[in-house]
């Protein structure tokens, strides 16, 4: 029910954006340029690339070399940007179903010059996800599973486009058909589906990396997909807001910033004790965006707004469980 409401909200926001089409060419160009850098930066950062957002922009937009960074990190940036360009060209040229060939093409561009032997090729070895209990399919089954996956992609379905895109991402990373580049390929596939459906791309923020990986793993180990599907829906929601605010002439690009607050900083900002923040986190009212090497919780800046909402609801004498249900 909660997810259905979220998808209804996305449909409504898309309708608002659709009523503004065609967008002015300057707005389209600015958004395309920003999303190109942001998607490249975040997708690579999730996989461990150390280029900052600014460095990624210099590499992708200016073709510059950043001192102290490896050739592979530079190639990961330029390759992802090129793969995204190909995806957008494909979307603009046709509305046909996505094929295995398309997925292999995305992967080929992602690993170009990094691992030419395996780029655009299904794996022929067994692989594991480092630090995860998820057991991936035997390499002998990959070709069959990908054929089955492509058939599923081509099948008419009645689920919401955002859920369909998220499910496609989930299924591809669970098959894990490549030796490397599975996550980046899956996120580009997801965004290809979103673009084909008239939605903006979903950006998985660097600060959401832990939630993203945990939600995926929970589902892959037989648990609920709800947290994962909510995360993707929220990412699309943010992108819709960015587009709508751009049309209105408002600056929304900073919404994907990576500033994280320590518990003391958050507590001071909202006038609460550290112990209260810890308690609300334990009760599920607040989400931890990341954890330091020392085990300290870090919170996104938008947690401040959530706590303000909690304050309002507490004044109405709602219990913590009632507040949690209200905010979900």
Predicted segments, located by residue:
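Aromatic-rich, solvent-exposed beta-strand/loop patch
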Residues: 300
